Amino acid sequence: MMVPLLLSTYFITAVYGATHTFHWTTGWGNRNVDGIKERPVITCNGEYPWPDVRVAKGDRIEVYLTNGFNNTNTSLHFHGMFQRGTNQMDGVPYLTQCPIGPGDTMLYNFTVDENVGTYWYHSHTDGQYEDGMRGLFVIEDGENNKNFPYEYDEDVMLSIGEWYDTTVDVLTRKFLNLNNPTGAEPIPQNLILNNTMNLTWEVQPDTTYLLRIVNVGGFVSQYFWIEDHEMEVVEVDGVYVEKNTTNMLYITVAQRYAVLVHTKNDTSKNFAIMQKFDDTMLDVIPKDLQLNATSYLVYDKSKPMPEQNYVDSIDDYLDDFYLVPMDKEELYPEADHVITIDVIMDNLINGVNYAFFNNITYTTPKVPTLLTVLSAGQDALNPFIYGTNTNTFVLKKGEVVDLIVNNQDTGKHPFHLHGHVFQTILRDREFDDAKGEKPHSFNDSDHAAYPSIPMKRDTVYLNPQSNMVLRFKADNPGVWFFHCHIEWHLLQGLAVVMVEDPISIQNTASQHLTANGLQVCGNVKVPTQGNAAANDSDFFNLEGQNVQHKSIPTGFTKKGIIAMTFSCLAGVLGITMIAIYGFSEIPEPEIKVMRNLHLNPEDVLEKTSSSSVISASNSSSLEDSRNQKKKFIFF
């Protein structure tokens, strides 16, 4: 099945003006997205895919999101938006808002006055965006993108991702399960491009395209290349960069790249557009899993479609660490606040495999963290009130923060920080467990020199068993998530919270929940005041807060000791009963059986007695032997 690009983008909302208003209602419908299997997907106003949105810098966005599900909450996050002064519009349940209950409507209302470039939006609830609740979001730099720093002829959006043939709720029940003790992530069935497979992109010769590529998947990073065509990277995650030419991109989930592609003058041949799984992220590779997906760059649709394109090596992809921002912003000063977090994956006492930062798996509070900030007064400066299982750090206004992430896990992790772009000032190499290498934590006295002009973006990958250092300024008051964007790992709890300049949040009217936001809370019966335990009379009393399951204890517990004791007693009693049975007299029915078989009971007994280490002596008569056994039993 080949789908032309124009069919995949017909649902783009491309309007210009001061305010853009959208009314979206969630629902379910059956679609055959990958051309192989029909399955339920999340629809928008009964349609699928969700609309891609294109606006201009300075425009206002109004999205009325109605939850059309019968029994499931929902939410909407505009990925990469700074939301300066409008933290309540960031769309994270139990962090910046209450979940939107069935039948309810929430208005997301904000202005895009700082962001430009390539973004996307998605549900931030229970992995729903893997079921299709997502779309691309482009903010042009001035009307018709007139302030974009590079020349091009046409602007094209491409979303890439993986696709499952089963809904996320079913997969999650199997994933977060004691029968999956290693935490093996569900394996996707296919790779998709613009919500389909075998896409055709018809191009004009000698034309420069601005190609915006967004990985809207929830798990696997992808390699992306176009046969016999170079790509010039000009933007990453909304940050303009100096041109950097490459033949291949490595794109983690949630990352965005804008590249310039110049087409050929010759129209005699069509070319392959290639996607490839990063199969190192898969615990197992099923025999029927196709690791590559082929779409088509078409100069002449009357010509044959190309075969899939192979490359000599997938290691020759662009390393985004070395990209240079066009604004050439220098390395921020030495950090005022250093936060070190260690990534581990482990099991808790319920047998389920979880993800941890510093041995804490993120557990939602009873009161959304932003509402705790707004109701806590000066106590908002103390991270304790936000709960012992939210991994919350309080940042002072304007301080430079170093976020050191040590990966004790053997897998890659793409990390995303809400409300900011950060400078990636260090990313160590992979340390390969298969080669016997151990996890390598950051060493402040022994590391590579930081770049003078670091790369900036909002989503970056961390190598296996490695470390990285992200530096950013606490210049955007709000409650911001930092989390792994592998959706399975977020469901496992791989997240921390940054409460940034809480007193400024309290003193800014636009940071307070609207009447609609408070009504949403009331409808799902979520408290709007108090600490993580919903205690609004004593913010330092966390009794009743949500907490993670207990760790698996080391050594023997009381239950284990008792179980072992009774097991040993049962074993001793069992051996004793066997011995007693062995020395008991032969029942008359058994003697009759022996005689019917022409066996002498005395001979059988003599052989049995001579082989027993317990017997006192061999007997010459059956009666003597019986008497000995009776005495033994009596004893």
From Swiss-Prot:
Which ranges sit in the Extracellular compartment? 18-559
> What is the recorded membrane topology of this protein?
Single-pass type I membrane protein
> What cellular component GO annotations does this protein have?
extracellular region; fungal biofilm matrix; high-affinity iron permease complex
> Which cofactors are required for activity?
Cu cation
GO MF annotations, alphabetized: copper ion binding; ferroxidase activity; iron ion transmembrane transporter activity
Q: Specify the signal sequence span.
A: 1-17
Q: Which residues take part in binding Cu cation 3?
A: 124, 418, 483
Cite the binding residues for Cu cation 4.
Answer: 413, 484, 489
EC number assigned by the record: 1.-.-.-
Q: Which residues are glycosylated?
A: 70, 73, 109, 194, 198, 244, 265, 292, 359, 443, 535
Residue intervals on the Cytoplasmic side: 581-628
Q: Name one Pfam family in it.
A: Cu-oxidase
Q: Which GO terms describe its biological process?
A: arsenate ion transmembrane transport; cellular response to iron ion starvation; intracellular copper ion homeostasis; reductive iron assimilation; response to copper ion
| Keywords recorded for this protein, A-Z | Cell membrane, Copper, Glycoprotein, Ion transport, Iron, Iron transport, Membrane, Metal-binding, Oxidoreductase, Repeat, Signal, Transmembrane, Transmembrane helix, Transport
Describe the task this protein carries out: Iron transport multicopper ferroxidase required for Fe(2+) high affinity uptake. Required to oxidize Fe(2+) and release it from the transporter. Essential component of copper-dependent iron transport.
Protein name from the UniProt record? Iron transport multicopper oxidase FET3
Q: Which gene encodes it?
A: FET3
